[in-house]
């Protein structure tokens, strides 16, 4: 929401428009079938592939430093979108990273500077900053923890990722409440109405979210909120519009459910205003998708898939070989991973990105040339599908 507020402020100052084609500000991006407008990006309807998936697929775990320039370079190579802009809504970390660069080019200031000058300093948010320097010491920074099994709790030491946009805000619950008062208090800013206007798809269908904010309802009360999730930490800032109560939660436990904690606080302090609890007050997790069953293949059958393949979209080489009767792939310099056959020319594998995404599940389908030999394959993971690889040897 800080990125959305920054964009809204620049819009009000006439320095940009949400109707702008993003290529006005980021000409490095491809010209897709339909232009991506800043409106699409701020409302998560751009269709841009998620860089948090693309980098692990390229053999770049987030334990390695990633810069905004590298993210822009990665996105400039993407030949396709997940969907046409404005047709669907899907949360996009990429869009907000690129919006940070739009802010920099429109204002002449990096996002961290802009936020400090326009928001943090004037509002007395002295404990808040956009983390843009991995060597910077942050006084009183809480250590994050993640759990690896029931009894294995570990500290999280990944501070190489220092590119603000979709995250990297260090703050306190007190400062979050100062921000909430700024947005919703009696002296609310001129951008207040724009920030809280519900977005729509291109066909006019409402999205249930405004600019960097979710619009919802809990037990009869209208809510405005956004959650945060990063290495060993979870957070939420939620406002109950009536009776005008804000709840800020910050956890240094990577498995904490900050949203559920906010609801528990509301249950206690707003009991008189809430309607009786029902069965569908909170979103339920979707059931885990079942993995396709393995299909046995002989050594000779697996051998036809061996070799090196290159993707210009990922700027990465995948090298396949057969080891002990199993097909394995080495992505750049990473350790070999088993690739499990699940059908005709179709395989699946998993890779680890412990710094952020955990386990990334991927699938691929090999493509054959006119003579029947394997010529390449299409790689996919989650919403990111159709990433092309061509045989090198």
How should each PLM-predicted stretch be described?
Residues 1-6, 97-101, 173, 178:
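Short amphipathic alpha-helical face segments that pack within enzyme cores
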């Amino acid at each position: 929401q800080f990125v959305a507020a920054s964009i809204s402020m620049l819009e009000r100052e006439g320095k940009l428009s949400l109707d702008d084609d993003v290529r006005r500000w980021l000409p490095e991006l491809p010209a897709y079938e339909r232009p991506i407008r800043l409106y699409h990006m701020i409302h998560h309807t751009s269709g841009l592939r998620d860089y948090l998936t693309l980098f692990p697929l390229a053999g770049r775990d987030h334990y390695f430093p990633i810069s905004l320039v590298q993210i822009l370079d990665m996105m400039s190579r993407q030949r396709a979108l997940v969907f046409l802009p404005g047709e669907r809504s899907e949360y996009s970390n990429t869009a907000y990273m690129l919006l940070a660069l739009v802010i920099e080019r429109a204002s002449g200031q990096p996002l961290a500077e802009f936020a400090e000058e326009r928001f943090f300093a004037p509002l007395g948010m002295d404990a808040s900053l956009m983390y843009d320097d991995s060597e910077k010491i942050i006084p009183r920074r809480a250590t994050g923890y993640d759990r690896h099994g029931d009894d294995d709790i570990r500290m999280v030491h990944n501070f190489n990722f220092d590119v603000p946009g979709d995250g990297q805000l260090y703050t306190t619950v007190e400062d979050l409440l100062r921000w909430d008062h700024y947005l919703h208090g009696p002296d609310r800013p001129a951008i207040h109405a724009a920030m809280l206007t519900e977005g729509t798809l291109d066909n006019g269908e409402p999205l249930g979210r405004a600019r960097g904010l979710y619009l919802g309802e809990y037990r009869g009360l209208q809510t405005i909120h956004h959650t945060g999730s990063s290495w060993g930490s979870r957070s939420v800032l939620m406002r109950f519009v009536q009776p005008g109560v804000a709840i800020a939660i910050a956890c240094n436990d990577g498995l904490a459910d900050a949203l559920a904690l906010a609801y528990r606080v509301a249950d206690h302090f707003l009991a008189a205003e809430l309607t009786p609890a029902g069965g569908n007050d909170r979103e339920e997790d979707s059931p885990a998708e079942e993995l396709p069953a393995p299909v046995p293949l002989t050594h000779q059958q697996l051998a036809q898939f061996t070799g090196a393949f290159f993707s210009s979209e990922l700027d990465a080489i995948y090298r396949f070989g057969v080891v002990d009767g199993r097909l394995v792939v080495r992505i750049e310099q990473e350790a070999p991973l088993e690739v499990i056959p699940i059908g005709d020319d179709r395989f699946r594998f998993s890779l680890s990105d412990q710094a952020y995404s955990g386990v990334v599940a991927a699938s691929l389908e090999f493509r054959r040339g006119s003579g029947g030999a394997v010529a390449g394959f299409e790689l996919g993971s989650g919403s990111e599908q159709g990433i092309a690889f061509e045989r090198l040897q």
